[in-house]
A protein has these predicted regions:
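Active-site microenvironments that recognize anionic phosphate/pyrophosphate groups
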Residues: 1-182, 253-255, 270-273, 279-446
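Helical scaffold of the NTase/Pol beta-like nucleotidyltransferase catalytic core
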Residues: 145-148, 181-205
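Structured alpha-helical segments in the cores of large, soluble enzyme domains
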Residues: 158-164, 189-197, 240-247
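Generic structural signal marking isolated hydrophobic packing positions
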Residues: 177, 220-221
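Catalytic or ion-translocation cores adjacent to nucleophile or general acid/base/metal-coordination motifs
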Residues: 184, 198-215, 223-275, 281-284
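Amphipathic alpha-helical segments that form well-ordered structural scaffolds
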Residues: 192-196, 275, 418
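A short, glycine/Asx- and small/polar-enriched loop/turn
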Residues: 215-219, 311
Length: 446
C-alpha cells in the first residue's frame, strides 16, 4: 500500500514538536520538513545531468522528469495545490478558468511577529535569486533546500529554469536571470522569449510588466505547458503591416486588446514586436482615452506571450495602459470598484490569458453566501458577506430560486461573469464597434 508523503512528514513533524526541536506552527513545520526532504533529493549536479541526458531524447522528456522531481521532493507541495478550488465558465470569449488559491499557507500571528523582529537579510536578495537553491530559509523567507534549478542560456547569458511552488496551472515554470537585475521590456525581451521557446517548444513563455502583481526587481518570465483560453481564441480579422508582409497579424477575439503575430521565422516576430512596442509606447489617441504619458509619467506597455504551434511561432501582444483618474484611482484599465468584492488585486499575466486567480477569502464567503441564498437570509446583516449584497441583486432575478443543489453552480457561474467583466475593464480598446475602430487607428500607424 502507498502512504502519502504528507502523512509521513506530518508524523515526523509532530514528533519534532513533541521533542521541542521545533515550534508547532506552519512556518516552522515547513522549514523543518524541507530540511528533511533535502536529505532525499538528488544533488543539483545530479539533477542537471539527468535532465541533460533526457533532453537528448526530447525536451518534453526532460521537463516531465524535472516536473515530477519538483513534486516528489515536496518543493511543490502537491497536497496543498490540490486544495485549490478550480472550475471553468463559458463566456463570449471561450472557456475561462477560475481558481481560488488556497495553497499559499496563511501565516500565524507568532511567525508574523518573529518575522517583524528578524533583522533584514540581503541574502538571497529575493525569492527568485539563484542563491535560493539549497537555502535553509528564515521565518520571513521560505526554505529552499529541496529546490533545484536547471541552468539555461537565454540571449547569450546565464539564466535559470524552475517550477513555481504554487502551480497555478500545469507545469507552471519561472525562467529568471542569473543576475538580480530589474525587469524591463525592450526588443531583447522578445529575443529571450523565443530563445526559451526554441529550447522547449511545448512550453509558452510570457513577460510580466509592472502592471501585474509579481517580483519586479528581478528580471524573469513565466511559462508552462498549458493552453489558456486566450491561446485558443481566434483572430477576428487580419492585417498586413508594411515591410512585414510575410507576417500574419490580427486582432484576437479577447476582452483585452491583443495583437497576434504569426510566422515560421521567429526573427521576424522579434523585429515586428519591437516596432509595435515602440509605436505603442509613444501612442496617444485622446478620443479613445489613450495617453502615452501625463506629467512625464509613461503609461503604455505591452504584455508579450510567445509560443510555438506546429511549425509556426506566435507572439501575442496585449496592449496595456495604467493611467488613473479621480473616478478610477487604481486605474482606468484596471478592475473597476463595482467588482472589488471578487477581485481587487491587479490583473497579472495569468489573468490576462484567461485564468482568474482569486483570493482565498472567497471560498468561505461563497459558502456563507450559498447558505444565506438558500435560507433566504439577509446578506447585508453578515459582515463577512455584506460586500456581496449589491452583486447578488444584479443576478438574483435571473434564476427561479436557490436550492442546495443549484446554488454553488450559480455562484460559480456568476463569479465567472464578473471575471469576464474585470478583463473587459482592463481592455484598452473595448469589444464594440467604436472600440474596434479606435484599435484600427493604432494599427494604421504601424
Amino acid at each position: 500500500e502507498t502512504i502519502e508523503l504528507e502523512t509521513v512528514l506530518a508524523g515526523l513533524l509532530d514528533e519534532a514538536c513533541k521533542r521541542g526541536i521545533i515550534e508547532d506552527s506552519i512556518v516552522y513545520r515547513d522549514l523543518f520538513d524541507t530540511k528533511i526532504m533535502n536529505c532525499l533529493t538528488p544533488r543539483p549536479a545530479q539533477v542537471q545531468a539527468e535532465f541533460a541526458k533526457r533532453y537528448e531524447v526530447s525536451p518534453k522528456e526532460a521537463t516531465d522528469y524535472f516536473y515530477k522531481l519538483s513534486q516528489d521532493s515536496d518543493y511543490i507541495r502537491r497536497y496543498r495545490v490540490k486544495k485549490d478550488r478550480k472550475w471553468k465558465v463559458d463566456s463570449a470569449y471561450g472557456e475561462i478558468d477560475i481558481t481560488i488559491n488556497l495553497s499559499k499557507p496563511e501565516k500565524d500571528p507568532k511567525a508574523i511577529a518573529a518575522a517583524k523582529n528578524a533583522k533584514a537579510s540581503s541574502y538571497p536578495k529575493c525569492q527568485l535569486c539563484v542563491e535560493n537553491e539549497g537555502y535553509a530559509g528564515l521565518v520571513n523567507h521560505p526554505a529552499r533546500e529541496n529546490h533545484r534549478i536547471i541552468p539555461i542560456t537565454v540571449n547569450d547569458s546565464a539564466w535559470g529554469f524552475q517550477y513555481s511552488p504554487y502551480v497555478y496551472y500545469n507545469e507552471h515554470c519561472i525562467v529568471f536571470n542569473g543576475e538580480h537585475t530589474p525587469m524591463k521590456i525592450e526588443k531583447q525581451t522578445f529575443v529571450k522569449l523565443f530563445d526559451f521557446v526554441k529550447l522547449f517548444p511545448h512550453y509558452f513563455l510570457a513577460d510580466l510588466p509592472i502592471v501585474g502583481g509579481s517580483i519586479l526587481s528581478h528580471d524573469h518570465f513565466q511559462g508552462g505547458n498549458y493552453t489558456f483560453a486566450m491561446a485558443k481564441a481566434p483572430m477576428e480579422e487580419t492585417f498586413t503591416i508594411k515591410n512585414f508582409e510575410d507576417v500574419e497579424v490580427g486582432i484576437v477575439k479577447w476582452p483585452l486588446s491583443v495583437l497576434r503575430l504569426r510566422s515560421t521565422d521567429e526573427s521576424r516576430l522579434i523585429e515586428l514586436g519591437a516596432h509595435i512596442l515602440d509605436a505603442w509606447r509613444g501612442y496617444t489617441d485622446e478620443a479613445a482615452f489613450v495617453f502615452a504619458n501625463t506629467d512625464g509619467e509613461p503609461h503604455n506597455t505591452i504584455t508579450p506571450i510567445a509560443r510555438k504551434v506546429g511549425d509556426t511561432y506566435e507572439l501575442d501582444l496585449a496592449l496595456r495602459n495604467n493611467i488613473t483618474t479621480e473616478e478610477h484611482p487604481l486605474g482606468v484599465y484596471h478592475p473597476h470598484a463595482q467588482w472589488h468584492n471578487i477581485k481587487k488585486e491587479n490583473i497579472g499575466l495569468i489573468e490576462v490569458m484567461g485564468l482568474a486567480v482569486l483570493p482565498s477569502r472567497l471560498k468561505e464567503e461563497m459558502e456563507i453566501l450559498a447558505d444565506y441564498l438558500v435560507e433566504g437570509k439577509n446578506i447585508r446583516e453578515n459582515e463577512k458577506i455584506e460586500k456581496h449584497a449589491d452583486w447578488v441583486e444584479t443576478f438574483r432575478g435571473k434564476y427561479d430560486g436557490f436550492t442546495k443543489e443549484n446554488v454553488m453552480e450559480i455562484l460559480e457561474k456568476e463569479v465567472g461573469i464578473v471575471f469576464t467583466n474585470v478583463l473587459e475593464d482592463a481592455g484598452v480598446y473595448k469589444c464594440t464597434e467604436e472600440g474596434r475602430i479606435a484599435f484600427k487607428r493604432f494599427i494604421e500607424t504601424l
